[in-house]
């Protein structure tokens, strides 16, 4: 079949004026037409198809001009005055030979010659005009191919280069019989040659034709050759050309033009991944993704090598992304908080989840939700006990080995990450990076509701719960709920009275290790902040600033209900509970509630019998400090 395709071109007959004359009897279009089967048409290259089109166009137009078009059935043959593209659709369409069983060709882009006559009208070629003249013989021809054939016969050459032929046609297209210009009927423009007018008129015709067929003739000839076994597949394929999208998902309103694509798209919502790699077990939503994975990861050589560390990667894109770990490049910047990312996927996930508050991955065991799927997978190991790494010092368990190694530094005292600005050292690199933002003033996590910014993402997430009202951490003893797990753990120590961190100097106990470290500065006088007014020392600059308000009388925090002012914001928050009626601190023994935590602690001493305040004169003990102060006045009055 391939050999037949190579010799197809010379067998196409060319109709000349000498061949078509009314005196020679009726000649039908069928007599000179050449038809190809679907298989034969597929073997032609683009140049051969173009030649077929041009020859058939010239033959058909020439026969129509001399009135010899008799190949049309009588009931469909129009009059000479009304000959149009629609009336000769049968004569213009080449037969596709024996049809393929159950084959349905795409009607939008099939490669057939159904636009021969329309193209002739579109180009504006008139049969009685002969714009092509032979320089050698002076003979005139209606078509360039006739001129070329005539010149080949005169010179004996069978092949003329395309460049020489084009130049010859351009130089010989003027009509010397008249000095009249050729006007365009659509716009006020004249042309000295008929060829110039014809070329100009194609611009108008193309626009009209684009409205009729949504594509130009040239695009339709070479765009699509797809053949389908079932009619339903043709219908779905034609939606590619029409833009129709028949399948719509109700939840999100996304439209797709194929049922297959619609089913594949639904997997993104139900997390179905039916295509599993038989080598590594990784699953994928789409079959083509699985094929690409197997070719890229398991079969293809890793030919892209990083010059920094020597790591080999399977694609140039992966190499570019990997090199960002060395050069620190983070090209994807969030326009909300300014945070930058190395990978586009991480950037998109950040925008979709962090700022919207969406947490789509929910643990089926405890109901806790997560932003990323890998966070949920990591969390589920808490329930399954999978891959737990236990500390030999304290027995604490970790999901990852690296987390255990980091934890060991607490026992060894190793702090390898040191701040170059202040010399402070940290166990984890992440903590160092967060600490450095104190020096730079960077606060990349910005709340889109109130505009407050944060150094750490954990602080930002905890702050978001203030707006949402979410209190996911509930005390099992009293039912009180908290925004963060850390706050819940602190609260638990109220019930257990646990103060595991004890000062070796004075024996005072603390709930948290950080509080003990702050307290120990008082004994070591390390980095103490002293008040210039009274000489009192504080372990933190923040505490000193709060204390100095005592001397200045500054009370910047004012209650909007009653106008009362306070030195500290925490005092204002506690005071506002008087107006709201909120009493969050409940006694577990008698269910009495209090506004302030210290009042609850004092009250609980009634039940426990604890009396920590002892008089130095008589040894009498009290459960409240002010009771001791009032008692001591008795001894003052007794003194002479």
Swiss-Prot record:
Its main location: nucleus. It is found in: Nucleus. PANTHER family: FI01424P, ZINC FINGER AND SCAN DOMAIN-CONTAINING. This is Zinc finger protein 549. The lineage of its organism: Eukaryota, Metazoa, Chordata, Craniata, Vertebrata. It comes from Homo sapiens. Gene3D superfamilies: 6.10.140.140, Classic Zinc Finger. A zinc finger (C2H2-type) spans 217-241, 247-269, 275-298, 304-326, 332-355, 361-383, 389-411, 417-439, 445-467, 473-495, 501-523, 529-551, 557-579, 585-607, 613-635. GO terms for cellular component: nucleus. There is a cross-link at residue 223 (Glycyl lysine isopeptide (Lys-Gly) (interchain with G-Cter in SUMO2)). InterPro entries: KRAB, KRAB_dom_sf, Znf_C2H2_sf, Znf_C2H2_type. It holds the Pfam family zf-C2H2. Keywords: DNA-binding, Isopeptide bond, Metal-binding, Nucleus, Repeat, Transcription, Transcription regulation, Ubl conjugation, Zinc, Zinc-finger. Residues 27-140 form the KRAB domain. Belongs to the krueppel C2H2-type zinc-finger protein family. SUPFAM superfamilies: beta-beta-alpha zinc fingers (SSF57667), KRAB domain (Kruppel-associated box) (SSF109640). The gene is ZNF549. The keyword Protein biosynthesis does not apply. May be involved in transcriptional regulation. One of its GO terms (molecular function) is DNA-binding transcription factor activity, RNA polymerase II-specific. GO terms for biological process: regulation of transcription by RNA polymerase II. The keyword Ion transport does not apply.
């Amino acid at each position: 079949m391939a050999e037949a395709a190579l010799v197809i071109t010379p067998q196409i007959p060319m109709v000349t004026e000498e061949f078509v004359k009314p005196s020679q009897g009726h000649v039908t279009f069928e007599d000179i037409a050449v038809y190809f089967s679907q298989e034969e048409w597929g073997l032609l290259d683009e140049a051969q198809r173009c030649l077929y089109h041009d020859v058939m166009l010239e033959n058909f137009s020439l026969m129509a001009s001399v009135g010899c078009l008799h190949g049309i059935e009588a009931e469909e043959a129009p009059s000479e005055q009304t000959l149009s593209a629609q009336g000769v659709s049968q004569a213009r369409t080449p037969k596709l030979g024996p049809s393929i069983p159950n084959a349905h060709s795409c009607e939008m882009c099939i490669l057939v010659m159904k636009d021969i006559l329309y193209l002739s009208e579109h180009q504006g070629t008139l049969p009685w005009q002969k714009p092509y003249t032979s320089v050698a013989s002076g003979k005139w021809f209606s078509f360039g191919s006739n001129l070329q054939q005539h010149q080949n016969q005169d010179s004996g050459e069978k092949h003329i280069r395309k460049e020489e032929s084009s130049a010859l046609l351009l130089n010989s297209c003027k009509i010397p019989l008249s000095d009249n210009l050729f006007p365009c009927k659509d716009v006020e423009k004249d042309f000295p040659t008929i060829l110039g007018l014809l070329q100009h008129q194609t611009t108008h015709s193309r626009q009209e034709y684009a409205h009729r067929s949504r594509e130009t003739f040239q695009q339709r000839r070479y765009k699509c050759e797809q053949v389908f076994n079932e009619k339903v597949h043709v219908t779905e394929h034609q939606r590619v050309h029409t833009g129709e999208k028949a399948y719509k998902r109700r939840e999100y309103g996304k439209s797709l033009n194929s049922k297959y694509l619609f089913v594949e798209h639904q997997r993104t919502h139900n997390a179905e991944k039916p295509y599993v790699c038989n080598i590594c077990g990784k699953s994928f939503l789409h079959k083509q993704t699985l094929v690409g994975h197997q070719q890229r990861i398991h079969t293809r050589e890793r030919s892209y090598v990083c010059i920094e560390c020597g790591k080999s990667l399977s694609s140039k894109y992966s190499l570019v992304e990997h090199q960002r770990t060395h050069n620190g490049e983070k090209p994807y910047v969030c326009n909300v908080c300014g945070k930058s990312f190395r990978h586009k996927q991480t950037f998109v996930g950040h925008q979709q989840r962090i700022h919207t508050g969406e947490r789509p991955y929910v643990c089926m065991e405890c109901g806790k939700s997560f932003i990323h799927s890998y966070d949920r997978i990591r969390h589920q190991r808490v329930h399954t006990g999978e891959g737990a790494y236990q500390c030999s010092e304290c027995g604490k368990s970790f999901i990852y080995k690296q987390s255990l190694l980091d934890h060991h530094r607490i026992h060894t005292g190793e702090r390898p990450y040191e701040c170059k600005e202040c010399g402070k050292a940290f166990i984890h690199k992440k903590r160092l990076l967060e600490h450095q933002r104190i020096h730079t003033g960077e606060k990349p996590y910005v709340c889109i509701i109130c505009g407050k910014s944060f150094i750490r993402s954990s602080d930002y997430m905890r702050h978001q719960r203030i707006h949402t009202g979410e209190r996911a951490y509930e005390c099992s003893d009293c039912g009180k709920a908290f925004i963060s797990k850390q706050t819940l753990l602190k609260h638990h120590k109220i019930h257990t009275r646990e103060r595991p961190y004890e000062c070796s100097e004075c024996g005072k106990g603390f709930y948290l290790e950080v509080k003990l470290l702050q307290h120990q500065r008082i004994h070591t006088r390390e980095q103490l902040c002293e008040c210039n007014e009274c000489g009192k020392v504080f372990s933190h600059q923040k505490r000193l600033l709060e204390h100095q308000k005592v001397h200045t009388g500054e009370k910047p925090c004012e209650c909007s209900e009653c106008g009362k002012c306070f030195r500290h914001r925490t005092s204002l928050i506690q005071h506002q509970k008087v107006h709201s009626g909120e009493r969050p601190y409940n006694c577990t023994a008698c269910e009495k509630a209090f506004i302030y935590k210290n009042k609850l602690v004092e009250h609980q001493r009634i039940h426990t019998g604890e009396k920590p305040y002892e008089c130095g004169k008589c040894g009498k003990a009290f459960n409240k400090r002010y009771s001791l102060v009032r008692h001591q006045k008795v001894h003052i009055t007794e003194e002479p």
